[in-house]
């Protein structure tokens, strides 16, 4: 996958390209990240990249000419088929379904805003999609862009040690993930659930699914409303709810 990044601070993306899963993906040639800074497309000695908004008000906007020139340079490098994405609080909220959708692209250009944002006409003429990572404000689009790259890269074949890892992540099937345990078997008088030590793969799968359903019901119940549960899932959720309510009564 090829990703172009438009940013005033491209060095921030070393967190993606030099470390962890995404760093290995870059090293192994599975992920290619290139950068264009609007500062490199300025023509004044101060390398100005911000400008005052029409109508007044606090803050500045990114200057149109350097930003557009940077986007055009990235488009030329990408060739045909690259989607241009602006990271913005006004965009569609990124979720696992959206990540899967974005992962089908072989080429993306991510535009990271700064200051109070970018000119609306640039959005209309240069941007294909707007995406947000949540209903809050950050200082720029770099962190959302890194979040998007990390989440999408997990779906590139060969990036994860076991491709099933991406399929079993939280939200992969619309549910939160189940609890996980590793050694030691007993930690401060707390045991690993016996079923996980049984070697019975059918029962382990059933337990994990029930815990996933139950955890979603407890922590993110709104997610269940958008799902069409199977008969098995409905039974397991009801079973979890009975067990949970029984435990609460004991306390």
UniProtKB/Swiss-Prot annotation:
GO BP, sorted A to Z: tRNA N1-guanine methylation
Residues that, per the record, bind S-adenosyl-L-methionine: 113, 133-138
Subcellular location: Cytoplasm
Keywords: Cytoplasm, Methyltransferase, S-adenosyl-L-methionine, Transferase, tRNA processing
Transmembrane stretches, start-end: none
InterPro entries in alphabetical order: Alpha/beta_knot_MTases, tRNA_m1G_MeTrfase_C_sf, tRNA_m1G_MeTrfase_TrmD, tRNA_m1G_MTases_N, tRNA_MeTrfase_TRMD/TRM10
Gene3D superfamilies linked to this entry: 3.40.1280.10, tRNA(m1g37)methyltransferase, domain 2
EC number, as in UniProt: 2.1.1.228
SUPFAM superfamilies: alpha/beta knot (SSF75217)
Catalysed reaction, written as an equation: guanosine(37) in tRNA + S-adenosyl-L-methionine = N(1)-methylguanosine(37) in tRNA + S-adenosyl-L-homocysteine + H(+)
Short name of one Pfam family: tRNA_m1G_MT
Keyword DNA-binding listed: no
Record-linked CDD domains: TrmD-like
GO molecular function: tRNA (guanine(37)-N1)-methyltransferase activity
One Gene Ontology cellular component annotation held by this UniProt entry: cytosol
Classification via HAMAP family: TrmD
Function: Specifically methylates guanosine-37 in various tRNAs.
Family statement: Belongs to the RNA methyltransferase TrmD family.
Subunit structure: Homodimer.
Record protein name field: tRNA (guanine-N(1)-)-methyltransferase
Organism from which the protein derives: Pectobacterium atrosepticum (strain SCRI 1043 / ATCC BAA-672)
């Amino acid at each position: 996958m090829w990703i172009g990044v438009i940013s005033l601070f491209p060095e921030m993306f070393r967190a993606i390209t030099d470390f962890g899963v995404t760093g290995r993906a870059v090293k192994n040639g599975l992920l290619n990240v290139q950068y264009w800074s609007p500062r490199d497309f300025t023509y004044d000695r101060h390398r100005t990249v911000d400008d005052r908004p029409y109508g007044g008000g606090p803050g500045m906007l990114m200057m149109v000419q350097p930003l557009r020139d940077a986007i055009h340079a990235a488009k030329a490098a990408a060739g045909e088929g690259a989607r241009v994405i602006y990271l913005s609080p006004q965009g569609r909220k990124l979720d696992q379904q959206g990540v899967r959708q974005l992962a089908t692209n072989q080429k993306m250009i991510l535009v990271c805003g700064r200051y109070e944002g970018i000119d609306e006409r640039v959005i209309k003429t240069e941007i294909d999609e707007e995406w947000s990572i949540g209903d809050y404000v950050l200082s720029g689009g770099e962190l959302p862009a890194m979040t998007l790259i990390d989440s999408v890269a997990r779906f590139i074949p060969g990036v994860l040690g076991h491709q099933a890892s991406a399929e079993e992540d939280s939200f992969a099937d619309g549910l939160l993930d189940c609890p996980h345990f590793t050694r030691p078997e007993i930690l401060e008088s707390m045991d690993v659930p016996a079923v996980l030590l049984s070697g019975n793969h059918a029962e382990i799968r059933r337990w994990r699914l029930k815990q996933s359903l139950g955890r979603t019901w407890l922590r993110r119940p709104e997610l269940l409303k958008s799902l069409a549960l199977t008969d098995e899932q409905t039974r397991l959720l009801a079973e979890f709810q009975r067990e949970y309510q029984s435990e609460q009564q004991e306390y």
